[in-house]
Swiss-Prot record:
Signal peptide: 1-16
SUPFAM superfamilies named among the record's database cross-references: L domain-like
Gene Ontology biological-process entries: negative regulation of angiogenesis; negative regulation of collagen fibril organization; negative regulation of endothelial cell migration; negative regulation of vascular endothelial growth factor signaling pathway; positive regulation of macroautophagy; positive regulation of mitochondrial depolarization; positive regulation of mitochondrial fission; positive regulation of phosphatidylinositol 3-kinase/protein kinase B signal transduction
PANTHER family: AGAP008170-PA, DECORIN
Protein name (Swiss-Prot/TrEMBL): Decorin
UniProt keyword annotations, A-Z: Disulfide bond, Extracellular matrix, Glycoprotein, Leucine-rich repeat, Proteoglycan, Repeat, Secreted, Signal
Species this protein is from: Bos taurus
Propeptide: 17-30
Amino acid sequence: MKATIIFLLVAQVSWAGPFQQKGLFDFMLEDEASGIGPEEHFPEVPEIEPMGPVCPFRCQCHLRVVQCSDLGLEKVPKDLPPDTALLDLQNNKITEIKDGDFKNLKNLHTLILINNKISKISPGAFAPLVKLERLYLSKNQLKELPEKMPKTLQELRVHENEITKVRKSVFNGLNQMIVVELGTNPLKSSGIENGAFQGMKKLSYIRIADTNITTIPQGLPPSLTELHLDGNKITKVDAASLKGLNNLAKLGLSFNSISAVDNGSLANTPHLRELHLNNNKLVKVPGGLADHKYIQVVYLHNNNISAIGSNDFCPPGYNTKKASYSGVSLFSNPVQYWEIQPSTFRCVYVRAAVQLGNYK
């Protein structure tokens, strides 16, 4: 019986076809009709969406800040990320700003172009920058202010250029402007159009220092709180030039050639707190200080003041409602300090606030 069973098994094996070596592809073909689709073996790879603009070559990008400073660039990099909020291009060799240089930068808030070689800006270069608030163009070679600046602009700094003209039209519609810095330019009084700054209703700070202007610009906006005109060639302070500046708190006129301040000038600035008239050619203390309610700091050192009256700084009497002086400088004037009456500074409650010294 065992022999019969063994014989049948051997016969069955001998009837089978010869063994064939199969590859992986052969087994895959056999599975085609098994109800298992090939996609279950090789899942479909989803399409990769194209990447957005990458950081420009050699620049650094982080948290919407693109820093391309100190790279020797001769033009604005292309393909800047559209979500850029701050673009720093200072300390390069850019010579011109062209239309399209800032296309798609609708979210840009701050543009820094300090210390380049920019001499030309196309009229429509800043048109795409519909949210720009701060524009820094200092230390370039501009001869005029750029046209068609964004209406959203709040701060403009253009000191150390070659600007000789300030036209009223360049500031038209800039109702959000707060700060304008124009110092160290070859400006003359004739180059500033009358009322050039008047249309900027929120303007709070103007600095036109170290230029060639000989008079205080006319038609300044009443919103001003700080006016810095130090280091110019102004010879006189006219009452009319300060008319309407009711909010002015700080007036800088040091390092000029001022020999006189018209009576009534300070009355036009009723909220003035600081007056800098040091390093001029004054021969007497400006009138109106005693009647000024809020003024606290008066710098008059390095002038030609030879006498000080007992009522030059404080109103008559002791029971007066006036802010106390925190700083009065009179050193380096020909006045002899021992000739000043003791009651002259009766409204000064801190002795160290008054600085006197020998004339050199």
